[in-house]
């Protein structure tokens, strides 16, 4: 995930001002958690962002998923870029991209930019997006530091129930509905 400077500055300023920080700051992990909350629940109230972040943390704690926030969010099949394929390059110099619509969180492999567009093309700040991003960062920091009420129990899944009903949802139990998302566990 590429971090833009305005998004990074918001992350840095908020993380340094939160009272009661209990863990060392891992900006990359917090950024991944905040980006997921932003893209999955940006138009929802604060509790929606908290709930989405809690699902990610539940997955990190589970033996069924990777044990880092960024790995949970980016989990799924990847393919090598045509720009590096077939060339004699070491693995670390090759570029890989998620396969469209085949990852755990739809925004990560939808084919659109994953940059937080705080700055407009004219250079001015888009305050609506900036405020949604600030809420997402704040939610991520609180959840990362376990400073929130548990809204989702042990849920490791959710979906936007007003838009889709995935096949896997029929095999799971519903824990709660928060705004546009239905939170599930098995």
Describe each region flagged by the PLM.
Residues 3-13:
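Sec-dependent N-terminal signal peptides
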